[in-house]
């Protein structure tokens, strides 16, 4: 098929950032189309159906929750710029969350959507550090100071200026890394500030039906604004002449042109699509991008713009497995009703890195989607617990199918055993009778359904805050631009659309 269409803006990927960018651009009359390889929108924050049940992937809770009328926050900006009434998301606040360390769970910090709760707990359990904690919070840059240029300074060094107790340092980093770090055992200072505000100074909330509510709202806003969307229709190549993308070749053979291209699929993934149309050559030469940058022939180098040496985004190393257990009763009936999210680690030191084995069950995140303060009659009918642990993509990707399925079951049991050490005890037979369904996804699943290389949920550790690529009309939005999670992705799409298209 050789049909050809032109758009003001083509967006690669129908994830949260792509949808947000599309809505923003369509509001201002731009002819925009989103091209998505998969059959479901949402990207890393989507859902799937299995045996008649819908399971969220990605979203545990919406971060950055603030109440009505609070100004200068990411949530407020998103609602305003996407023209969403906050009631459309039906956000219910968390009950309360914990950070638990030690083999017996002996070190505990509580936090809620009231920052005073965590501060009071630190004052009680780490009295010598309370002044440092308050000074640390006061030193966090505001949102208006973030994002102009990446501050890749070690967040551990930054926190070390204020907090001396190594246990408290590890406990502070545990939830922030699990919910937003692409770097092993550290964070960029900017990312630390964003996540600390999102979790500790703002908070968690969730719609009754999870990510499906958010997606329904976004898709309807995009449709009403006049945006086009093509599902199961990915981009296979970005053909470039000189320093500009000239054509997008779709997987079905169609050719699309656009004045601007916004890509939400990741930095490395986007660059892997680029094909240089070089005058004088018989055929375009693909540019192969690796962790050390481009592998280019002398011929192609003579014809392409010299690339910024700093623009060598490596593939991310951090991926996860997640188990899901569905109950025929609410978690509180089992004695698990007070926790919304539990971040656990079974020693005093938190090791946030790609594990040597398939899974690292020593630490993880336990989420109870039922344990939010839903309006009457709006809580999920069935109970659920989700447990997330670090995983090694390479140890999963090449397994024969029979071994793969067996390993999933083996690790499901091991992850449950590890997580339950940090929850009130429930007899095995009671839990077995209450369980009506289970599932598990792995790094291999993540790559299959999102196309993210190495199952890297948080993308490359090298972020590009201005979204610029070696091509002057191709820009990044989403995880590799630097904002993560649902709120971060939405904000990224809005910001990149504003910066690169609407302000020109």
Regions found by a protein language model. Give the residues of each.
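N-terminal glycine-rich phosphate/pyrophosphate-binding loop and immediately adjacent elements
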Residues: 2-131
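Rossmann-like flavin
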Residues: 104-189
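Active-site-adjacent "gating/activation" loops or surface patches in catalytic cores
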Residues: 178-205, 469-472
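Helical element adjacent to the flavin cofactor pocket in flavoenzyme catalytic cores
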Residues: 195-245
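Mid-domain catalytic core of redox enzymes
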Residues: 236-281, 287, 298-379
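C-terminal segments that line or cap access tunnels to active or ligand-binding sites in enzymes
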Residues: 329-437
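A conserved FAD-binding loop/helix module that cradles the flavin
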Residues: 479-501
């Amino acid at each position: 098929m050789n049909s050809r269409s032109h758009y003001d803006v083509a967006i690669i990927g129908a994830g949260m950032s792509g949808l947000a960018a599309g809505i923003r651009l369509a509001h201002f009359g731009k002819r925009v189309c989103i091209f998505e390889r998969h059959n479901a929108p949402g990207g890393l924050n989507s859902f799937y159906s299995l045996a008649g049940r819908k399971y969220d992937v990605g979203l545990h809770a919406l971060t950055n929750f603030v109440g009505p009328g609070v100004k200068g926050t990411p949530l407020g900006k998103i609602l305003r710029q996407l023209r969403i009434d906050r009631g459309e998301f039906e956000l219910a606040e968390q009950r309360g969350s914990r950070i638990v360390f030690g083999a017996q769970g002996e070190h505990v910090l509580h936090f809620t959507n009231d920052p005073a709760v965590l501060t009071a707990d630190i004052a009680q359990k780490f009295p010598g550090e309370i002044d440092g904690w308050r000074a640390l919070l006061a030193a966090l840059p505001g949102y208006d100071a973030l994002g102009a240029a990446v501050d890749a300074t070690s967040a551990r060094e930054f926190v070390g200026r204020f907090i001396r107790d190594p246990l408290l340092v590890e406990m502070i980093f545990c939830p922030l890394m699990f919910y937003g770090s692409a770097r092993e055992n550290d964070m960029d200072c900017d990312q630390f500030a964003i996540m600390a505000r999102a979790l500790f100074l703002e908070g968690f909330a969730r719609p009754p039906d999870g990510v499906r509510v958010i997606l329904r709202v976004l898709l309807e806003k995009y449709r009403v604004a006049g945006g086009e969307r093509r599902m199961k229709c990915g981009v296979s190549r970005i053909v470039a002449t000189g320093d500009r993308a000239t054509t997008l070749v779709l997987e079905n053979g169609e050719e699309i042109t656009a004045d601007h291209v916004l890509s939400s699929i990741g930095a490395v993934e986007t660059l892997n699509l680029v094909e240089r149309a070089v005058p004088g050559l018989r055929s375009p030469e693909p540019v192969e991008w690796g962790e050390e940058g481009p592998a280019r022939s002398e011929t192609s180098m003579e014809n392409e713009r010299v690339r910024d040496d700093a623009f060598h985004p490596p593939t991310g190393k951090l991926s996860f497995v997640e188990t899901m257990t569905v109950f025929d009763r609410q978690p509180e009936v089992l004695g698990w009703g007070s926790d919304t999210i539990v971040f656990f680690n079974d020693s005093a030191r938190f090791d946030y890195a790609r594990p040597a084995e398939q899974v690292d069950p020593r630490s993880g995140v336990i989420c109870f989607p039922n344990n939010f303060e839903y309006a009457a009659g709006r809580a999920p009918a069935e109970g659920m617990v989700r447990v997330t642990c670090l995983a090694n993509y390479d140890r999963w990707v090449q397994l024969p199918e029979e071994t793969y399925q067996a390993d999933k079951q083996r690790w499901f049991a091991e992850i449950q055993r590890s997580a339950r050490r940090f929850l009130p005890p429930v007899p095995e037979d009671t839990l077995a009778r209450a369980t009506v369904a289970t599932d598990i996804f792995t790094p291999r699943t993540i790559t299959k359904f999102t196309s993210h290389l190495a199952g890297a949920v948080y993308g490359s550790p090298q972020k590009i805050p201005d979204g610029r690529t070696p091509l002057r009309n191709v820009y990044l939005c989403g995880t590799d631009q630097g904002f993560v999670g649902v709120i971060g992705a939405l904000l990224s799409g809005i910001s990149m659309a504003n910066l690169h298209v609407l302000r020109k």
